[in-house]
Design a protein with these regions (language model features):
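ATP-dependent carboxylate-amine ligase
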Residues: 1-65, 77-79, 99-102, 171-173, ...
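Phosphate-binding loop of NTP-binding sites
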Residues: 7, 13, 34-37, 58, ...
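Short, polar loop motifs at secondary-structure junctions
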Residues: 47-50, 68-70, 87-88, 246-249, ...
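Beta-strand->loop->alpha-helix junctions that form or flank phosphate-binding loops
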Residues: 65-69, 107-112, 151-154, 258-278, ...
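BRCT (BRCA1 C-terminal) domain core and associated BRCT-interaction motifs
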Residues: 67-80, 85
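Glycine-rich beta-strand-to-loop/alpha-helix junction loops that act as flexible
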Residues: 84-86, 246, 454-459
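Acidic-glycine-rich active-site phosphate/pyrophosphate-binding loop
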Residues: 275-293
């Protein structure tokens, strides 16, 4: 058993059993896994569960209650309730917790107080690419023998779990690793704490990957997000390191508000750069104009090469030399739901990707295009995120989807006029609200050699399996 201190309330009571409200989310599911490994009794509740998190929780033997009813409080009788940001006032379970005066805490605060405060935290922040970049960074440290803990919003193929405590490093079998890699999310913490999650983490090494407007349901504009990112910058110690995308003016503007930490930039001649990109997808790594390494991998897109530069810089801060980092990246396997091949039937390949913001959609299609050349790409989109449902980003969607040969957008559950917003795509656009008819329309328009790229941040009704079955 890992010797972690149990959480104590202010009156000295030991909080051994935690019950997680919203346990099915990628972050809270990761908190559950870490708490279980640390010796806590863990249970939780959520409305709907999707793989891979549902599979992970089941494998860990964690009891999950379906729904947010108040009766579960008597069923589980937890010592403290860890509240995810899916929870809202008005939910029966939340009102009961408040009315009964039961102890509660947010997921990020629980993690910070019980795990992170003891470790060298490496935080990966940015509007896009957090999960992939955090997975790369955790793997590079693992490959180097540093055995980090991590909590990532997806399941890295190199690890098969989304979260774990620090393990025994190769160099010192009598200790535990000091390193912990975390996906540092800008979304708000909980209904009672509207600060971004990452404010709780206090990283010693922070990657700022990119910054643009997103999460229109909680942020009024880009300035509001920049304010939260600057709160993160304020928490990085002067002996730490900020690794920053040098191509993003929005990040430079954030640093200009005040920065007390050394900064290394990537994507610029003054820092880390992608050198020659070879036909097989491998690329050279340059630092201050000099070629210092080479990465051979199968990942698609310039965005992933930029992610790699950030990881090499951050890993070097933790003591990993450049060559070892490049070797590790060459052995990196991507995260589930990041351009994940779900199957191939009759020469037609179906992919699954988490992309749900115009920039991420565009770079995902661009990456696939680089891989498949002139073969047809059928983009299948579910506008499911809160920002997408509000229609805040609808004007940017046509350009982001333009490189696809055919575009299929599922309009079920969306209040804005999808056909009107995506009209610039012309005859290659297909919009549907009936799910079964939507699947049939995709299949009708396929031909051998096609690549069907499904993009959603939810389960999308199991569309991948339905497509593969219908294509037989």
């Amino acid at each position: 058993m890992v010797a972690f201190p149990l959480f104590h309330s202010k009156d000295g009571l030991i909080m051994k059993h935690i019950h997680i409200i919203g346990i099915g989310g990628t972050f809270m599911g990761g908190v559950a896994a870490i708490a279980k490994e640390a010796g806590f009794k863990v249970s939780g509740c959520d409305a709907k569960m999707y793989p891979p998190m549902s599979t992970q929780l089941e494998a860990l033997g964690i009891d999950v209650h379906e729904g947010f009813d108040a009766a579960q409080l008597d069923e589980f009788k937890a010592d403290i309730y860890v509240i995810g940001n899916v929870a809202k006032r008005g939910m029966d379970v939340i009102e009961a917790i408040l009315n009964k005066g039961l102890p509660y805490i947010s997921g990020p605060q629980w993690l910070a107080e019980n795990v992170l405060h003891q470790h060298w935290v490496l935080g990966v922040a940015g509007t896009h690419g957090k999960t992939t970049t955090a997975s790369m960074l955790a793997w590079v440290l693992e490959y180097a023998g540093l055995a980090p803990g991590f909590l990532i919003g997806g399941v890295p193929e190199n690890f098969s779990v989304s979260a774990r405590l620090p393990q025994t490093p190769r160099q010192d079998p009598n200790s535990k690793s000091p390193f912990f890699v975390i996906e540092a999310d800008e979304y708000d913490t909980a209904f009672f704490d509207k600060r971004s999650k990452f404010v709780h983490y206090r990283p010693r090494t922070a990657i700022l990957n990119n910054l643009e407007f997103d999460h229109a349901d909680i942020f009024a504009d880009l300035d509001a997000i920049q304010t939260q990112f600057h709160h993160l910058v304020r928490t990085v110690p002067s002996e730490g390191l900020i690794v920053c995308n040098g191509q993003q003016q929005s990040l430079q503007d954030t640093l200009d508000k005040g920065c007390w930490t050394p900064v290394e930039k990537f994507g610029t001649e003054q820092g880390w750069q992608v050198g020659t990109v070879h036909a097989d997808g491998s690329f050279d790594v340059r630092h201050h104009g000099e070629t210092v390494g080479h990465v051979t991998w199968e990942l698609m897109g310039e965005h992933n090469r930029m992610n790699a530069l950030a990881v090499i810089s951050a890993a070097r801060h933790a003591g990993v030399d450049i060559q070892t980092a490049c070797e590790a990246l060459s052995a990196f396997k991507n995260v589930k739901r990041r351009m994940e091949i779900k199957g191939t039937v009759n020469g037609i390949t179906v992919y699954d990707d988490f992309a749900h913001h115009p920039t991420a959609i565009e770079t995902t299609i661009e990456g696939l295009r680089q891989r498949v050349g002139n073969a047809r790409i059928l983009a299948v989109l579910e506008p499911r995120s809160n920002t997408m449902k509000l229609g805040t980003m609808k004007a940017a969607l046509p350009a982001s989807l333009n490189d696809a040969d055919q575009v299929f957008c599922y309009a079920g559950g969306v209040d804005w006029d999808v056909a009107e917003a995506l009209a610039p795509l012309g005859s290659k656009l297909h919009v549907g609200k009936d799910f079964d008819a939507f699947v049939a329309e995709i299949v009708k328009n396929t031909e051998a050699g096609d690549h069907i790229l499904v993009m959603s941040n939810g389960g999308f009704g199991g569309i991948h399996g339905k497509l593969l079955e219908a294509l037989k």
